[in-house]
């Protein structure tokens, strides 16, 4: 075989010409010490705050403390595989998570990795978890209602799209139940075709038991609500950095809907546990402690998270992200550090009480202490018309009920007030998993406020309500449709309703 030298040199030249000049440079550091989920790393001089780093074992961490001679890294996962002297390399990426509609119906961890065994996430877009909240100009004031399906909330403490409404109460008072009912109440909208009516739901479970989260997901599945929801779970057995980052990850997923002209609601359940996880991380990183040993920036931790919930203006696509943070109090102490912080950040709070819960008032909302600072600007006209009086009457009732315990001889007007209050309180009770549509709530509250229940025994109020709703659904569907479409209670509709309510009241007389 004849080999020509010219040919060989031509082949060599061709290969040399295409030889890649770029060499991959990665900055590598060394683990100085590791323990309690924190690694001290030497040699990562150019690492950014909040950057993801990777350890030899494949475990990831986030650089939080940038000191003169070392970097404090919190570890997302177990630190058992990490040994002193091992190498750590920069990834060059700030912590980000997958976002988009591909996450709907899935359960993921704090970094967006699936944990439900349904295969990889179908998502192409990623977003940073910690971004700046929208400024003042792109926002719009809250003006559309975010229906929870609960009479006590939609009538008295209305929540609007883009609002931040805190759910606060002791353990076992039904905080998660309110959030769950709100998610289930969005099902009818998702069955329809009106994209603007749809509200996508993001639920972040922080520091909860795995069994509790599994039960929550099962209820969503059984009720057909998982298909428009995303569940982010950083359970009690997960590392503190996971519990710290999960709310930010959930927020980034919710912001995808907000920024693309859609509407979403995010539930942080609960932020007390996130604050505890952050306190643990901060103390281990040797940051100076403040009140109740929380770090000085724990207020900023929650404010930068909750400020990202917003109603966007017309130029920014009209989307919205509503936040329902949950805070667990100890023995109804609302004046502790974290509760006062979050109350001051949010636009109102739904205050749940153990005593009410055990008296059978469920949802156990204390109407006197609960407020919505956005208030009636987020209510439909129909609801405003009927629910205007109810708050005042209940406030008077509570005041009188306290005095009535002492005196037996009460005048007629006081007796009337006490009667009405007892029946309105009964009317606001609602079993779990049975949210009501806005127009149905209007009918029920109309009956209560206009005195049709005053002569009824208290134990018949629920029966009256069921009969009223049954009659409207079977014989007056056109009335329900009319109120729903117009969002107002016209005189003609009010007269129709009056007739229906009066006929049912007669049957109870």
UniProtKB/Swiss-Prot annotation:
Site annotation Required for activity: residues: 370
Say which enzyme class the record assigns: translocase
Listed InterPro entries? ATP_synth_asu-like_sf, ATP_synth_asu_C, ATP_synth_asu_C_sf, ATP_synth_F1_a_nt-bd_dom, ATP_synth_F1_asu, ATPase_a/bsu_AS, ATPase_F1/V1/A1_a/bsu_N, ATPase_F1/V1/A1_a/bsu_N_sf
Instruction: Report which reactions are catalysed by this protein.
Output: ATP + H2O + 4 H(+)(in) = ADP + phosphate + 5 H(+)(out)
Query: Subcellular location, in the record's words?
Result: Cell inner membrane
Q: Which residues bind ATP?
A: 169-176
Record-level GO cellular component terms: plasma membrane; proton-transporting ATP synthase complex
Topology relative to the membrane, per the entry?
Peripheral membrane protein
**Could you cite one Gene Ontology molecular function of this protein?**
ADP binding
EC nos: 7.1.2.2
- Taxonomically, the superkingdom here is Bacteria
Keyword set for this entry?
ATP synthesis, ATP-binding, Cell inner membrane, Cell membrane, CF(1), Hydrogen ion transport, Ion transport, Membrane, Nucleotide-binding, Translocase, Transport
Q: Which Pfam families match?
A: ATP-synt_ab (PF00006), ATP-synt_ab_C (PF00306), ATP-synt_ab_N (PF02874)
Provide the function of this protein.
Produces ATP from ADP in the presence of a proton gradient across the membrane. The alpha chain is a regulatory subunit.
Q: Which family does it belong to?
A: Belongs to the ATPase alpha/beta chains family.
UniProt subunit comment: F-type ATPases have 2 components, CF(1) - the catalytic core - and CF(0) - the membrane proton channel. CF(1) has five subunits: alpha(3), beta(3), gamma(1), delta(1), epsilon(1). CF(0) has three main subunits: a(1), b(2) and c(9-12). The alpha and beta chains form an alternating ring which encloses part of the gamma chain. CF(1) is attached to CF(0) by a central stalk formed by the gamma and epsilon chains, while a peripheral stalk is formed by the delta and b chains.
Q: What is this protein called?
A: ATP synthase subunit alpha
